[in-house]
Amino acid sequence: MNETQVIINLISADKDAMPDALAGLACSAAIAVSDIPVEALFSEVRVARINGEFVVNPGRAALENADMDFIVAATKNDITMVEGEADECTEAELVAALKIAHEAIKVQIEAQERLAALVGEKALVKRPLPEIPEHEEIKKRIEALASADIYALARSASDKDTRKTRVDEIKDATKAALLEAFGEEVMAEWAATADRYFEKLKKQVIRDVVLSDSLRLDGRKFDQIRPIWCEVDFLPSAHGSSVFTRGETQSLTSLTLGTKQDQALIDTALNPHDDKFILHYNFPPYSTGEVKPMRGPGRREVGHANLAGRSIRKVMPADVPYTVRIVSDILESNGSSSMATVCAGTLALMDGGIQIKAPVAGIAMGAIADDKGRMAILSDILGDEDALGDMDFKVTGTAKGITGTQMDIKIDGMPYEMLEKALIQAREGRLHILGEMAKAIAVPNADLKPHAPRVIEFRIPRDFIGAVIGPGGKIIQEMQRQTGTTISIDEDTDGGIVAIFGPDKASLDAAYGQIQAIVFIPEVGSLFEGVVEELAEYGAFIKFKGKTGLMHVSEYDHRRIENIADVLKVGDPITFKILDVDAKTGKMKLSRRAITAKPDGTMPTDEENAARANRGGGGDRGGDRRGGGGGRDDRRGGGGGGRGGDDRRGGGGGFRGR
């Protein structure tokens, strides 16, 4: 049969529109108006629950408030695909969402049918399918040769490697018998057909064993989960790590905590944004015992990472100051590797001290049905059960409810009752898996790993953002160089949010102190300790908390001092009180006299100090030479580097990419 390719291009869109929910409708409509044969028209919609009400195809702004978000595809009669996420919804709520989506899809399919009718004969009369060549004698001979052996294998409760080896042996023996019976010339012509017959027979026999004997390939019951082994703190240098093994599927997952500079740019057509939660899924060829070239991420890697990531994201705390990166390396695979990634990712987060709301586990469900009305719902499916089955239904969630799901149904006639049964069975399996995970770690560790980066966050006034950054980012970059930290500043309506990332407390304290010195606003009457920075005829310039103020010679003591150099020298420590701060220039008058007893033993009153401050006499040193400290414009040195882009982030480094 010829392949059919439909290419969908987004030409233009309203920024509030969600074009992904319309792609299926466009695809099916294109086929509907062509002469390409199709078993059934389909469509897809997004269904979300917003403020307790289900909405079909909501806009992007409305979707921000949704606690359920699913894309559903279906024909007129049956659901065929589901993918989405939820804030721990129940199984019944998911089924309710599917039913609402299905009703909307039926309307869209009817519109396609009317469109095809308008096109007329070109759309209504489909081209005939080419006949597939058949050879009944070869087909019967394969059934006679291989059926019994395949049946015995299906009942043998074997592992993946043993099963594969035995299938190859049966196939080779069958080929040899066919070659002897029909000769080389015939078999050379019908080799592909013979392979097709063998694969179809294998599928039929194994499916019949499941339905008739209630026996799975590895000997499990329908609702039985494979043995689980998991461990945390597996990698000594990672910020968190875990190994999760379920049967013959294993994920080694690591957690890395980075800075805001490490956020991933999600460059979508309508909603480009930075994401501080990243999950990467790697499926190397050795995980299935194969030799293949290592290329970039394919659909499998992207799709599995997306499903696992959206499932775990639902339990991430909102106040995590780090960029969180989870990497799942599949070491061996025999089905459900994406669900192993969910489990291993959760364990790694808890091992790393990330305070997730609740552990998340995932399970892959399958189904096998026949035209006699028999159906088996299988928990924790194998790779072979996925290939020969009729459904692949991945469900993730906490003990409370569902956080993510992905379902593909390959047959017609999957009633809602069976979907509900699959969801209930999936919940039972999920709870079992969560129990096994709890044996390794039940709650997140209280602290981060010793070698994980530390971070502090605090706010600064909006007027000081430019002063901290400096012209062209000069000040913040020098601060990072001196302290060995990475500093980022984000701006919101309330000012600036500063995040400092460093390897230890000392580096954080050093950077924090420098920033506090810049944003420090001195208050009249406050006591401070400072250091003499420079002497002049009329007084001393004192440095404290990153600021500089003038102590006039008359404010050193109650007795007359002719030369300030007689009592102070550069580098001397000194305690003083701020006598006055000029509201316009920020220049400060400092006084030791204000905190020194008078000759009669009494202390100066606030009124006396205020009177001296108002009289002036502090001496003027040429105005802006020192600027009195605290003037934002002087510190910025004439502006420079604006508030956005790289200057705000102050450089830094870290991982980026897959």
Where are these predicted regions, by residue range?
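Mobile "lid/hinge" segments at catalytic clefts and subdomain interfaces of large enzymes
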Residues: 34-158, 349-446
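Glycine-rich, flexible beta-strand/loop modules in the N-terminal catalytic cores of phosphate-handling
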Residues: 1-4, 10-12, 17, 76, ...
